[in-house]
Amino acid sequence: MEGALGERLKREYGLAFDEHLAMARLIYQPEGAAALRELWGGYIDIARRYALPFMATTPTRRANRERLAAANSTGQVIADNVAFLREIQKNSGIEMYVGGLMGCRGDAYTGEGALPEDEALEFHRWTAEQFRCAGADFLYAGIMPTLPEAAGLARAVDETGMAYIISFTIQADGKLIDGATISDAVEYIDSITDNKPLCYMTNCVHPSIAAKALGQEFNRTACVWKRFCGIQANTSPLSYAELDGAEDLHCSEPEEFAEEMMKLGEFPNVRIWGGCCGTDHRHMEHIAKKIRGRHGEKQLQL
């Protein structure tokens, strides 16, 4: 999966994000579009060198109906972001999947402003339908901090019939921000959907924290081991509270980071490896090298 976009766009390219839509409007700016092409191009080159399938997601986590209205925009922003990434896919020459990124209504790190399940269904239904109409290959619900909102979003995507992944905001204690265990969250969402998520993941968290979370006794269940399949990881072992608003990134060295990622191989179905805050092409290259070293010349599939 792709590595960091947002932090790199700010720190390496000096780009400012929209107050309502964050990165979703960058495709309309020459500098923003060029930076996105360059970052994705670098990640694609790594996937090509190591013969790995590649997943990328539109920078649209904040592009929900409420925020689009506040920005005086429409769902065309979603369609244009999917089309932009689709063009990159067509020119990539690799096995690549275009994901539509969705997110929670409120704060992904604290859970503040999170929606109850039925309200979440109504809130996310429109966004999911926009991605269906735009033709994304799958939907990716990133850093979901609470079970009720994640469940409501899953129900909304369930209605579209699209493939999708739910990625939780998790802590070392093995729970989401609202206190739901990973196991309970997976079991509950699977129980209320006909078109179940392809799998579950976590993102914006260090692999050592994810390992502690998954290793909690109440998460060492058949459903977690079968259904939890990936991580899009931070390079810093700091907690969400410590990371949020940090002036400086706390970055692990690429090789050390890749070693920490591979320790998640204890969990048998973890097969989606991506980067979040602090990662760049060096980190993703070391991860790809580790994956290829582990599997030899075997053709890998998602």
Give names to the regions the model predicted:
Residues M1-L302:
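Domain-level signal for soluble alpha/beta catalytic cores
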